[in-house]
């Protein structure tokens, strides 16, 4: 797992060699921030129609006395722009990998009701497709919206208690689900 993260990181570093400042944007997903998932993203122009973006989410903090919402996630994405990078419509293909420790969380729409009474530790990985639009506000500032759907594989262990280590089960799950929902504040470095 760590090896995969190192490989992705090296590829991203190699892609940034020789870049000028006009080809880089830094961003944060405001929706994820509102859901207590602090994050940062960096996007680099590769050509007249392509860019590569990677966002990293990290929350090491407990959400409350018995509530767990700790996680980290890395999601690199290759983007095709219909006009030019950092403006207008884009389509993307992304990979994702993350680790989580969640429990006693009430999710909307009755999703994953089992995490209300147990704690889950595990990892997920997947791939998906994205559609988005980049709204230019000024020469440096933009708002970007995007949604994505894809395939996820989840491995987890279930624990009865939030503080003790009594394991009550484990499992794997494969499913198609939303993989991205973003309204991002973007700063283009010029």
Give the location of each predicted region.
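Transmembrane beta-strands of outer-membrane beta-barrel pores
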Residues: 30-34, 56-62, 80, 95-101, ...
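Solvent-exposed loop/turn segments connecting transmembrane beta-strands
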Residues: 25-40, 59-70, 85
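Membrane-embedded beta-strand positions of outer-membrane beta-barrel proteins
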Residues: 26-28, 42, 54, 76, ...
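Repeated loop/turn-to-beta-strand initiation elements of outer-membrane beta-barrel proteins
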Residues: 24, 50-52, 86, 140-143
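Residues that define the transmembrane beta-barrel architecture of outer-membrane proteins
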Residues: 22, 34-36, 68-74, 87, ...
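Outer-membrane beta-barrel channels and translocator barrels
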Residues: 47-49, 83-87, 136-138, 190
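Flexible, solvent-exposed loop segments that connect beta-strands
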Residues: 58-71, 99-123, 155-174
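Outer-membrane beta-barrel "beta-signal"
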Residues: 81, 175-190
């Amino acid at each position: 797992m760590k090896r995969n993260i190192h490989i992705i990181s090296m590829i991203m570093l190699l892609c940034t060699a020789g870049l000028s400042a006009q080809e880089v944007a830094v961003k944060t997903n405001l929706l994820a921030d509102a859901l207590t998932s602090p994050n940062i993203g960096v996007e680099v122009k590769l050509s007249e129609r392509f860019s590569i973006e990677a966002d990293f989410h990290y929350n090491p903090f407990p959400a409350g006395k018995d509530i767990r919402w700790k996680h980290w996630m890395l999601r690199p994405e290759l983007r095709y722009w219909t006009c030019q990078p950092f403006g207008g419509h884009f389509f993307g293909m992304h990979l994702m990998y993350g680790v989580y420790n969640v429990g006693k969380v009430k999710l909307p729409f009755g999703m994953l009701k089992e995490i209300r009474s147990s704690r889950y530790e595990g990892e997920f990985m997947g791939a998906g497709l994205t559609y988005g639009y980049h709204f230019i506000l000024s020469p440096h500032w933009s708002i970007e919206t995007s949604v994505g759907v894809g395939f996820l594989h989840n491995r987890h262990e279930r624990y009865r208690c939030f503080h003790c280590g009594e394991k009550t089960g484990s499992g794997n799950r494969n499913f198609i689900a939303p993989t991205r929902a973003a309204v991002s504040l973007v700063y283009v470095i010029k």
